[in-house]
Amino acid sequence: MSKLLSGQVALVTGGAAGIGRATAQAFAAAGVKVVVADLDSAGGEGTVEAIRQAGGEAVFIRCDVTRDAEVKALVEGCAAAYGRLDYAFNNAGIEIEQGKLADGNEAEFDAIMAVNVKGVWLCMKHQIPLMLAQGGGAIVNTASVAGLGAAPKMSIYAASKHAVIGLTKSAAIEYAKKGIRVNAVCPAVIDTDMFRRAYEADPRKAEFAAAMHPLGRVGRVEEIAAAVLYLCS
């Protein structure tokens, strides 16, 4: 796969940690030049440093994906840094602990939808024209198993991930004939810092999460990264 991707340019949002960091590192290991984007400057720069220490090439651009001007500047920054954009992994997202639907509040709804839905829409809105101008590209959006079904106390998050899948399908249909492939990955529970913080206080929750999966364990960030690179190849 590295021969297929080598020399190309990838943008990874939410690249400061977790799935985003692992995917940025996987792209770099395959010879791809990587633009890492995140609100967390320290984490994003840490990802870039790890890539460079491993012999890869990367730059960091701070970006709030909920703001149109910042996303526009991010994509322009990709073109300025490397001249093109071949792959985009729109991974930035949040999950706020929720109660039942009727107990939710407007602030939670707005925050989740702004990052998880508007953020993905804005990223594709600005990535697609650049890809069209260069003759094609590949986009992968991070959805979730929550976007394929439902679970208690996750109504807003589930709605946001259903929306990501809808955006992905629509973009895929609209731009396939123009050489742009658009797909989504739908992770279940993944072993990230966020997961560990959520379950460290109650090991029983971690055991329950592992038992939900046919493999008997939660997923690994490297497994999602491999799926993203496959979809880009």
Residue ranges and their predicted role:
Residues 129, 173-177:
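Alpha-helical segment proximal to the catalytic Tyr-Lys
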Residues 99-101, 105-110, 209:
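Substrate-binding pocket helix/loop in short-chain dehydrogenase/reductase
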Residues 124, 160, 168:
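Active-site helix of classical SDR
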Residues 101-102, 149-155, 177-178, 216:
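Active-site loop immediately N-terminal to the catalytic Tyr-X3-Lys motif
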Residues 144:
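Residue(s) in the substrate-gating loop at a strand-loop-helix junction
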Residues 184, 204-233:
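C-terminal helical subdomain
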Residues 1, 177, 189-212:
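A glycine/serine/threonine-rich, flexible loop-to-helix segment
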